[in-house]
């Protein structure tokens, strides 16, 4: 069974320098957060800053999960649950810093089978580049989401 989180942002999409590539990356169904970040920026410092900004938003999203998440039943026989969540701008942006930055994603899908995801070669490479505690925030949101799923669904392994 597959679980997906679908994020719908208020703002159209990203920062001017990478908006075209980002739009192209996210026009394809199923692009993951990490694949998208690799696609939209080859510059390591910019990529790390974008990653950090996304994780700030994810942290805020965790705090507001109950208010913003809506569960929908599987449709057309697909064994999946989609959580549609409004992804707000980070506190940093709301305080007037980084005004030129727009919300990074129009939509993105994250695979919740994170133990397997994190064990993949690409994820190991990313873990060496990005702060381990920040990556743990992604695990945290998966745990919070899983706790809201009906008890009849299987555990994440």
Regions picked out by a protein language model, each given a short descriptive name:
Residues 24, 101-157:
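Short loop/turn elements at secondary-structure junctions
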């Amino acid at each position: 069974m597959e679980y997906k989180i679908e994020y719908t942002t208020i703002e159209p999409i990203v920062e001017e320098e990478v908006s075209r590539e980002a739009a192209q990356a996210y026009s394809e169904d199923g692009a993951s957060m990490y694949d998208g970040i690799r696609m939209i920026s080859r510059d390591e410092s910019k990529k790390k800053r974008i990653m950090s900004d996304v994780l700030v938003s994810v942290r805020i999203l965790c705090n507001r999960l109950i208010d913003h998440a809506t569960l929908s039943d599987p449709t057309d026989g697909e064994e999946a649950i989609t959580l549609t969540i409004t992804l707000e701008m980070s506190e940093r942006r709301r305080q007037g810093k980084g005004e030129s930055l727009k919300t990074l994603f129009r939509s993105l899908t994250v695979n919740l089978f994170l133990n397997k995801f994190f064990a993949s070669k690409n994820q190991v490479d990313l873990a060496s580049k990005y702060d381990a505690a920040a990556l743990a925030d992604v695990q945290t949101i998966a745990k919070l989401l899983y706790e809201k799923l009906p008890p009849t669904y299987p555990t994440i392994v």
